[in-house]
Amino acid sequence: MADFEAMKDTWSDVEDRDGVRLSWNTFPSSRMEASRLVVPIGALYTPLKEKTDTPLLQYEPVVCRAPCKGVLNPYCQVDMRARVWICPFCLNRNQLPPHYKDISQEQIPPELHPSSTTIEYRLPKPARCAPIFIFVIDTCQEEDSLKALKDSIIMSLSLLPAYALVGLITYGTMTQVHELGYTECAKSYVFRGNKDYSTKQVQTMIGLGQMAAPRPGMQAQPGQPGGAPPTAAMRFILPVGQCEFQLTNVLESLQRDPWPVANDKRALRCTGVALSVASGLLEASNFVNTGARIMLFAGGPATEGPGMVVGPELREPIRSHHDIDRDNIKYYKKALKFYETLAKRVSTNGHIVDIFAGCLDQVGLLEMRGLANTTGGHMILTDSFTSSMYKQSFARVFNKDADDNLLMGFNAEMEVLTTKELKVTGLIGHAVSLNKKSVNVGETECGIGNTCAWKMCGIDPEASYGIYFEIAGQGGPSGMTGGAPQAIMQFLTYYQHSSGQMHLRVTTVSRPMSGPSGDPALAQSFDQEAAAVLMSRIAVFKAEVDDGPDVLRWVDRMLIRLCSRFAEYRKDDPSSFRLEKNFTLYPQFMFHLRRSQFLQVFNNSPDETAFYRHVLNHEDVGNSLVMIQPTLDSYGFDHEGGQPVLLDSASIQSETVLLLDTFFHILIFHGETMAEWRKAGYQDQEGYENFRTLLEAPKEDAKDLIQDRFPLPRFIVCDAGGSQARFLLSKLNPSTTHQTSTYGGVAQTAQTIFTDDVSLQTFMDHLMKLAVSGTS
């Protein structure tokens, strides 16, 4: 395919402009044709993708009448003389508002401009109140870890706008809600750690009583968005500018949990109660459906009360994947039910839960994953709060844009509209269903389905969502456009901007429908990178409910069917198998997905698996591909700078340095000779400047990779034969193992990997054999 590179550039430009990548860029015209695609029609959409030239309009959008509510966009037919526009989604004729009376072909409003496929509206309605941050701190920690945690939170106060509201809850054996509005001395309300509390009980115990909600019409003060918090709630949740001194004092004087811990016991931690009370505090203070983040800092697992994941006896280990497989799980089901119920409550309120784990052992991310996954919260897994990985990742949560606004949205919702050719089958990402049924909701379900609208709660510029579609019927041209029929989809994202205003981001995407059955345009429109990421999200979604081997079989079956459908071959002749250029990388993406930590749980704790899957479901195409198939660069004397090499054991050479990027780890690996020279100190001697430069080059490139990455990756420097080299060896295609012969054409210098895993070549041989035989 001669123009493959040009098409790739076009898809990349669309991603930069609209934050959208589609698995197929031409849609089949019938359901029958669609069923033969194997890979579903899907879009990976990043609603808040940062883009300097996205117009920000300071007025309400022009919308179609209910129930459609489609927004005026460049694909609408507009009758300038009659001041009428036709909605492409429901084909209704709508009158343009009076202030559009002067529009003409030469003078069109920004939202109708052909380049305005993505546009943002700053809605006149302010948010009910400023964003809220509730810090929930575990005090059962070593002194140095607790001090580092307190310092990082004190630092974060300076990154928050003065009008942002803050609250503080600490927990150990008991949970304490701190009354920041009381300035005479430190004052807190204590809740028992072994009992769950309803919102009513929280309200009564902290003396909030029945309170009035903020008045809907309350106008924002200059520099203070939204209304102020209700008076009684001001005792616990206050603007940073008002309580920073008091909050800093309380944080600085925080001590380790005083409850004694025997040598053979774990500290008693009531994480579940602390989170439940945090949610209850927001509900009792009448902050429902306002932007709020509950930020949990856990230094260990919950060992007491509802949500406990392990008992206090150290001789009782926390559950492993093996225990879960054998159903040897004492607390898992009960804890999971507790946190899932809490997640439902929190997401209904529009609040976000972030989980920061600072512990070498597991803290219960597996049980708590629903809290972050359904509310768009962050999940950060580190060894300790003293680590730079935690400190820098936490600081990056508060990144700001050019106007000094926090790069985060609150209380977000997304709706997807489509023309009659398409129906929405579901979404995979950090969201919950809003159970909105409409004519464009599909019969089948993929991910969170049976709806065309979802609630995200938390949203940021990297947050990406996989949205899946099906073809509605037997096709036929759209009633909208002359010429080649087009299918149109519109993404509407409503969210509370950190400045306190409500915003609406609108992205409208149009793609051609294919011609008669067998149209080559379909195959040529396949974006293998987007398809690999969309399929990996489905695989991970399945892995949450199905057995691991079943998911791997599903991945294999889909790949064989895709190759059978789109490869060129003579039946039963594997040597004749050939894939077009825009399909060639797809099998190797699937090979690495099968071996990845997303589907293989061996050597990972359940908490790590939950963390890795959480991040995959948050990132865009580029970052997700790095996670699925890491990048490997080689540095040697025979070329300047890094040179991309195959992710293969044959790439390990004694006289090179390798830089591996798995997204979660950045690793610099020195070949045997390089490591010996470095240990001998040649780089510090005169005349070996080129060796010094060679050693520095991968470090500089690693710095660039780490620069904007969130969460901060673990940085590893290792040598051939060193224990840390396992991070590299586990990712490489094992083309040179202890089973391949030394005279089999493989360079003697390549690394031997001791594994029974099949190599990419063997995998491809089997794939070709099965694809040409028509076996699926």
UniProtKB/Swiss-Prot annotation:
Membrane topology: Peripheral membrane protein
SUPFAM superfamilies with a match to the protein in the record: beta-sandwich domain of Sec23/24 (SSF81995), C-terminal, gelsolin-like domain of Sec23/24 (SSF82754), Helical domain of Sec23/24 (SSF81811), vWA-like (SSF53300), Zn-finger domain of Sec23/24 (SSF82919)
Pfam families from the UniProt entry: Gelsolin (PF00626), Sec23_BS (PF08033), Sec23_helical (PF04815), Sec23_trunk (PF04811), zf-Sec23_Sec24 (PF04810)
GO function terms (MF aspect): GTPase activator activity; zinc ion binding
Chain residues that bind Zn(2+): C64, C68, C87, C90
Primary localisation category: cytoplasm
Gene Ontology CC terms: COPII vesicle coat; endoplasmic reticulum exit site; endoplasmic reticulum membrane; Golgi membrane
Job description of the protein: Component of the coat protein complex II (COPII) which promotes the formation of transport vesicles from the endoplasmic reticulum (ER). The coat has two main functions, the physical deformation of the endoplasmic reticulum membrane into vesicles and the selection of cargo molecules.
Known partners and oligomeric status: The COPII coat is composed of at least 5 proteins: the SEC23/24 complex, the SEC13/31 complex, and the protein SAR1.
Protein name: Protein transport protein SEC23
Source species of the chain: Phaeosphaeria nodorum (strain SN15 / ATCC MYA-4574 / FGSC 10173)
